Amino acid sequence: MTSQVRQNFHQDCEAAINRQINLELYASYVYLSMAYYFDRDDQALHNFAKFFKNQSHEEREHAEKLMKVQNQRGGRIFLQDVKKPEKDEWGSGVEALESSLQLEKSVNQSLLDLHKVCSEHNDPHMCDFIETHYLDEQVKSIKELGDWVTNLRRMGAPQNGMAEYLFDKHTLGKEST
């Protein structure tokens, strides 16, 4: 059944939004895996766990926001299977942050691709939505993760376990307060 509210909403934009929803849910799933990995007794980096759990929640919210706009525009949501994370063991904190950085960069590229599709189909509403709610936040997140990886490497991580312990306690501990 065709939506009565659909206006200036190309099928390519609708399909690209559905792909982005799936990617955001995948990112949420990856971060959830990371969170509970660092919560294990043999890792015990509780602020890493808390950070990744918050990231998981944020990515799920991104997916839900896209679902809401899909409905508002008269599109249809077609959920796909969410791929399992690439790994079950995330290694050290710095290795997990490097994986997180790569994930955020791929999410950002996908958002840029979505923006391009919407722009090519003259959909200023969707372009504005992506710019307002996603792109700036992605750039800030990528910068923060890059800075953290640099600082952890500077302190000798992952070979120096004290570096990750102090980072967990002082840097990520401040993030969660």
Swiss-Prot record:
Q: Does the keyword Oxidoreductase apply?
A: yes
Q: Which residues form a coiled coil?
A: none
PROSITE patterns xref list:
FERRITIN_1 (PS00540), FERRITIN_2 (PS00204), FERRITIN_LIKE (PS50905)
Q: Which domain of life is it from?
A: Eukaryota
Pfam families per the record?
Answer: Ferritin
- Binding positions (Fe cation 1): 24, 59, 62
Quote the EC number: 1.16.3.1
A single BP term in Gene Ontology: intracellular iron ion homeostasis
List of residues binding Fe cation 2 = 59, 104, 138
**Would you name any one GO CC term?**
cytoplasm
Catalytic activity, reaction form: 4 Fe(2+) + O2 + 4 H(+) = 4 Fe(3+) + 2 H2O
Tissue specificity of this protein: Liver, gonads, head kidney, heart and spleen.
Which positions fall inside the Ferritin-like diiron domain? 7-156
Q: What does the record give under GO molecular function?
A: ferric iron binding; ferrous iron binding; ferroxidase activity
Indicate the enzyme's highest-level EC class: oxidoreductase
Query: Which key words tag this protein in UniProt?
Result: Iron, Iron storage, Metal-binding, Oxidoreductase
Q: Which InterPro entries match?
A: Ferritin, Ferritin-like, Ferritin-like_diiron, Ferritin-like_SF, Ferritin_CS, Ferritin_DPS_dom
Q: How does it assemble?
A: Oligomer of 24 subunits. There are at least two types of subunits. The functional molecule forms a roughly spherical shell with a diameter of 12 nm and contains a central cavity into which the insoluble mineral iron core is deposited.
PANTHER family tied to this protein? FERRITIN, FERRITIN HEAVY CHAIN
Q: Which family does it belong to?
A: Belongs to the ferritin family.
Q: What this chain does, per the record?
A: Stores iron in a soluble, non-toxic, readily available form. Important for iron homeostasis. Has ferroxidase activity. Iron is taken up in the ferrous form and deposited as ferric hydroxides after oxidation.
Name this protein carries in UniProt: Ferritin, heavy subunit
